[in-house]
């Protein structure tokens, strides 16, 4: 488990040396937000550039999030494109890029639309080479604002205070408190626990602005982390082993052992990188060792 904080312009003036001294290893920065007045006005966080440069100078891992108002696919795409062009481009991030889903004015009572918005955001940034994820509250977000079963492929950052998440059973990061304190800063802070070695996954997969050769000093991952180059999108495969029912999908949704399916997408850097399915669109997630190329 790795401890980190998430901050925005509300924490302007915080001395990041105090963050390092308190034992925190990463920061998730608010890159920007969509204004709730129109739901389509995009704004960079006033402290994003400052915090990014200060964090990198101190060796802190950095991720980012976008406060979303999107309630359909195209709005999700638009938010992602604006974030990329104005916040992400030319930088390197050691932690995922998240869509923050909590806006009550635009994202309440629209589960189907919000689900599509999340897909639009995540697919757009994945296609640009980013490791993406979803931030939301355990109940009021993941349960009430989206169809989580349609978003199995994406990493989850779950907010729940007082106890670990209960509705979301598979997640990479937990926001455990909004009242964290550190010496030298007179204010509350959001505290987080990461359960994956995101810097290693991201750097070795060449994502989030890092070179494809796995740039950085992080050791190479275990063989199961990096997808086999022998399998690619469009290949027909036979399922010869089980998929992953806890992190990225349920193998049973793609058919049993011995069934023939097609590789629909490859998620570099994931332990179960191959999404397979058939003409009905049902999918499951597998390692290369569980698939036989036909």
Please state what every model-predicted region is.
Residues 84-98, 103, 145-171:
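Structural recognition of alpha->loop->beta junctions
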Residues 219-268:
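Beta-loop motif signature
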Residues 1-13, 17-18, 149-222:
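Functionally critical loop-and-helix segments that line ligand-binding/catalytic clefts
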Residues 1-122, 126-129:
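Substrate-binding cleft of extracellular glycoside hydrolase catalytic domains
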Residues 278-294:
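Intrinsically disordered, low-complexity, charged/polar segments
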Residues 125-143:
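Aromatic-lined carbohydrate-recognition surfaces of secreted/lumenal glycan-active proteins
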């Amino acid at each position: 488990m790795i401890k980190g904080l998430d901050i925005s312009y509300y924490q302007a003036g915080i001395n990041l040396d105090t963050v390092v001294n308190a034992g925190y290893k990463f920061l998730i920065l608010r890159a920007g937000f969509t204004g709730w007045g129109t739901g389509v006005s995009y704004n960079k966080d006033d402290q994003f550039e400052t915090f990014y440069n200060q964090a990198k100078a101190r060796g802190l891992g950095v991720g980012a999030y976008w406060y979303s108002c999107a309630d359909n696919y195209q709005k999700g795409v638009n938010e992602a494109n604006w974030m990329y062009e104005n916040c992400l481009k030319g930088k390197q991030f050691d932690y995922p890029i998240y869509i923050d889903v909590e806006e009550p004015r635009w994202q309440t009572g629209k589960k189907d639309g919000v689900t599509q918005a999340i897909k639009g955001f995540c697919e757009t940034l994945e296609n640009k080479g980013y490791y993406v994820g979803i931030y939301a509250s355990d109940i009021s977000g993941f349960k009430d604002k989206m169809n989580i079963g349609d978003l199995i492929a994406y990493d989850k950052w779950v907010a729940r205070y007082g106890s670990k998440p209960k509705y979301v059973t598979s997640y990479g990061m937990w926001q455990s408190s909004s009242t964290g304190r550190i010496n030298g800063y007179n204010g509350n802070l959001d505290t987080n626990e990461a359960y994956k070695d995101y810097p290693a996954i991201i750097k070795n997969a060449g994502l989030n602005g890092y070179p494809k050769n796995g740039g950085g000093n992080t050791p190479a991952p275990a063989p199961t982390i990096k997808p086999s180059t022998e399998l690619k999108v469009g290949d027909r495969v036979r399922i010869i082993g089980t998929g992953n029912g806890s992190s990225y999908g349920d193998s049973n949704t793609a058919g049993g052992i011995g069934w023939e399916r097609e590789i629909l997408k490859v998620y570099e850097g994931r332990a179960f990188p191959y999404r397979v399915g058939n003409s009905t669109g049902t999918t499951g997630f597998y390692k290369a060792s569980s698939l036989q190329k036909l």
